[in-house]
A protein has these predicted regions:
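Short conserved micro-motifs at the rims of enzyme active sites and ligand-binding pockets
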Residues: 145-147, 181-185
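Conserved, well-folded catalytic cores of nucleic-acid-processing
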Residues: 48-51, 137, 175, 192-195, ...
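Short, charged alpha-helical interaction segments and adjacent helix-coil junctions
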Residues: 2-18, 91-96, 184-285
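Accessory alpha/beta interaction modules
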Residues: 1-168, 244
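Short, solvent-exposed coil/turn linker segments
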Residues: 64, 156, 173, 197, ...
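Short hinge/gating elements
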Residues: 24-33, 172-176, 198, 235
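Extended serine/threonine-enriched, polar tracts that run as long, contiguous segments within proteins
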Residues: 166-168, 175-183
Length: 285
């Protein structure tokens, strides 16, 4: 019933610039990799780099321009955005809404895939150049780190010496961000992903005047909005399915614990209290 109500509500919802989900996969690919949007993705990349005092770039060329037909056919590249800077550094960007510790391996795999693709067979290793991976996450990946933006490089442990600048992995954990994390350009972009009002963002960073125009173009396109809605539905039902599986897993574990306690002749009332199962459920085990 809830699923039906969600579908009906979302079908009739009027999409505006401010209620548009800025983390939607279709929208992000359009905003950051559609031809003509190079200045927008460049501003975001530079915001990430400035935040940790790395060099910035003057321009980028998008290597995987957004193509709606390919997107709908599932033939778009595995990373959301891939571009190259004026000094031949590759930047890959991915927005991930759900995940766990295995995302670290996934991001390493995507980085390695991009790095290895820089060389054709028999080409000299001197042709290799840095690959920067930027991962924007709508979940917490590193519970032991308070910072919402962390960056990993290849280092020698004893002397803390960086081996090479060819491997750089940025992780931006949106749930960790709060208004006290005011870090100029990057702060504005995080607010954007989290749904900040566009008029406020324009006051902080004039690139959002251009972003606002692209958002409106996206909304005005029926094919794009249809693809956007479809992605929203997919994410909703996937999340709902994962929640059900998680709840069923927890309940199965409770039954197993209760069964073991019952075999140890533990009082049924204590088993019920310990597991949250009713006494009737315990008796049936």
């Amino acid at each position: 019933m809830e699923e039906f109500e969600y579908l009906e509500k979302s079908k009739n919802e009027i999409i505006t610039i401010d209620n548009l989900n800025k983390k939607n996969d279709c929208f992000i690919r359009y905003l950051f990799s559609d031809e003509g949007n190079e200045n927008i993705v460049l501003d975001f990349i530079n915001g990430v780099m400035i935040d940790l005092n790395f060099q910035t770039f003057n321009n980028v060329v998008i290597l995987n321009p957004f193509n709606l037909t390919k997107y709908l056919d599932g033939k778009e590249s595995i990373v959301d955005v891939k571009c190259i800077t004026e000094d031949n550094q590759t930047v890959i960007i991915e927005i991930q809404l759900q995940g766990n510790q295995y995302f670290i391996r996934r991001s390493l795999y995507y980085w390695a895939n991009s790095y290895s693709s820089l060389l054709n067979k028999s080409e000299n290793y001197t042709k290799l150049s840095p690959v920067i991976s930027i991962n924007v996450l709508d979940f917490v990946l590193f519970n032991d780190i308070k910072d919402f933006h962390s960056c990993y490089l290849l280092k020698e442990i004893k002397h803390n010496k960086i081996l090479t600048d060819h491997c750089m992995l940025h992780y931006i954990e949106l749930p960790k961000f709060n208004l006290n994390n005011n870090k100029e350009k990057l702060s504005s972009w995080i607010k954007f992903f989290k749904g900040e009002n566009m008029s406020n963002l324009i006051k902080e960073n004039n690139i959002f005047e251009e972003v606002e125009k692209r958002c409106q173009s996206f909304i005005d396109s029926d094919p794009l909005i249809n693809a956007y809605r479809k992605k929203e539905w997919n994410e909703y039902f996937y999340k709902d399915m994962m929640n059900v599986e998680r709840e069923e897993g927890i309940k199965s574990e409770k039954y197993l614990i209760a069964k073991n306690l019952k075999q140890m002749n533990i009082d049924k009332a204590l088993i019920s209290k310990a597991t949250g199962l009713s006494i009737e459920e315990v008796e049936k085990l």
